[in-house]
Amino acid sequence: LLHVLAGHAVCRGTAGAHFTGLLRRSFMGYDVSFHPISPEEMREWYFTPLSWVQQGQEEKVLALAAQHGMEDFYAEKYLDTLRVGAGTEPDELFDKSHGFYIAVIQGFFRDYYYTRGSAFSFLVEEKPEYARYFTPWAQVTPTAFPNPAENQIIENYCSGVYLSPKQVTQLLRDLEQDPKVLEDLEGLWSNGQLAVLKKALTAAAELGVGLLEATEVVEPNPIRPNESTSYSNLYHCDRDGVYLYIDTVSTQLADVIGKSEEQA
């Protein structure tokens, strides 16, 4: 089903084969974002307001947004996101519906962080032992949901793993004290990206909250940055990872142009 969410088309459904995910990662890439949020905030900002929308009490959502100083434009986007969430069918993947929407709504309340193509979901595919840092949705949601969950990124427009507040502090500690953890993460978050991930983890730790990853909440345009888009609040996206992406693409373009000139 194709739903329109705040002026953008969002493809929703239960499809999400692992093979499809690998293909997309190889050829299309992923815009990965990291969202500091606690289970309590998920309840306060998403699950409870979701029930308000389902009960026809949308004015409560706008009151909550105003209470947090949210601008009217983003308050409406917030409400639109909850409306889409309220229409989620019980057989839709949690990761492609509620999980993704939680990442979106987090960005209306506070900053989130971006890295191109690097995610814990991809790390745990190669190194399953890293699952010790993640908490499945069944242990996070305030009530049981019928929606099946993969608990990781399986395709675009999808939530990934969730690190609890304790897991955030544990991973930060291990990054400092365990050379193997540092090496493994540097292997995936390369070319300066690890600093962005540590910034996200540190922000979450300082707030005493967990960290949720997702894909395509924000989609930077490295060629025309002013045309970047976000289902959430674009201005709450930390710029460091975006600048790294722009620099990488600029370097790649320069290489391509240089080679084509050599061949001419």
Predicted regions and their residues:
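Short, Lys/Arg-enriched N-terminal segments with co-localized hydrophobic residues
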Residues: L1-F27
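Acidic (Asp/Glu-rich) sequence patches and key acidic residues
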Residues: L22-A264
